């Protein structure tokens, strides 16, 4: 995706980026590629691919969620900062927290945030299972984001405990999302969540299937969830 198309497609969706914001995306791209030579951040390094499959894809969450009405966001397993850093660039008032299990990635994100001049960001090197059991984070966030981290029954156990009651968990998925959603029904019931939207669309240019699944946190998650590190993945809730 060329930068001009990136800008135009966002404008069509009602998001008009300033030159300063476009410059931030350019800096993000160059920093990502530079650091990727030292550590494995992404398999996608060509400029058009990064703009489409990382930047634009991350921002599709805003096509279905009004981020101007969200104060606090936590991104679980953000890797190289997707989707939360692109969203932070477009919605600078967001207070963004990122948790990732790899310390090197957190180092990259701290450097990136500083050089982009982002305010209101926090980064934690932690497992999602232990992070969500800490009282300063548990049920403290308006919105929890995750992009293709794990299958939905597993992801729900990692993410829903972080959402406030009446908050939102947004899972960004590809093809196979409907099957994951079916498999996650039991987990969602146990964790206090309920699906309110499953938005299916096609990523432009490559025409690949995408889903933005919006789950409302209707009641407090039982304290036993998430279970100890590794257990949600080995023994998914059903």
UniProtKB/Swiss-Prot annotation:
Its main location: cytoplasm. It comes from Halalkalibacterium halodurans (strain ATCC BAA-125 / DSM 18197 / FERM 7344 / JCM 9153 / C-125). InterPro entries: rRNA_ssu_MeTfrase_G, SAM-dependent_MTases_sf. S-adenosyl-L-methionine binds at residues 77, 82, 128-129, 147. It comes from the Bacteria. Its EC number is 2.1.1.-. Keywords: Cytoplasm, Methyltransferase, rRNA processing, S-adenosyl-L-methionine, Transferase. It holds the Pfam family GidB. The keyword Cytoplasm applies. This is Ribosomal RNA small subunit methyltransferase G. GO terms for molecular function: rRNA (guanine-N7-)-methyltransferase activity. Residues 216-238 are annotated as: Disordered. It is found in: Cytoplasm. GO terms for cellular component: cytosol. The keyword Cytoplasm applies.
